[in-house]
Amino acid sequence: MNSLLMITTCLVLFGTVWAKEGYLVSKSTGCKYECFWLGKNEGCDKECKAPNQGGGYGYCHAFACWCENLPESTPTYPIPGKSCGKK
């Protein structure tokens, strides 16, 4: 019983530690979400936590929104086969 509890705890921790992170990207254009206030940024945090993104925290890094604790289903920059601003 203790072994089962330890295994379950490890799996939960792995999910938390290895959560996806990256630049939030528009699926239609392939471009990163831009921001100008570096560091803590309400706009980036709001976008990352939006129900369709599912992130845990967002901030502005290198003039684009960086998100942490994203689900694997949320696309991050770059999207394969889609270049921002290029046809």
Swiss-Prot record:
Signal sequence, renumbered to the chain: 1-19
Residues carrying Cysteine amide: C84
Source domain of life: Eukaryota
Entry's Gene Ontology BP terms: defense response
Positions of the pro-segment in this chain: 85-87
Intrachain S-S bonds: C31-C84, C35-C60, C44-C65, C48-C67
Domain LCN-type CS-alpha/beta: 20-85
Single GO MF descriptor: toxin activity
Tissue specificity: Expressed by the venom gland.
Subcellular location, record wording: Secreted
This protein's GO CC annotations: extracellular region
Annotated function: Beta toxins bind voltage-independently at site-4 of sodium channels (Nav) and shift the voltage of activation toward more negative potentials thereby affecting sodium channel activation and promoting spontaneous and repetitive firing.
Similarity field: Belongs to the long (4 C-C) scorpion toxin superfamily. Sodium channel inhibitor family. Beta subfamily.
Entry text on domains: Has the structural arrangement of an alpha-helix connected to antiparallel beta-sheets by disulfide bonds (CS-alpha/beta).
Protein name, entry field: Neurotoxin Cex1
Organism: Centruroides exilicauda (Bark scorpion)
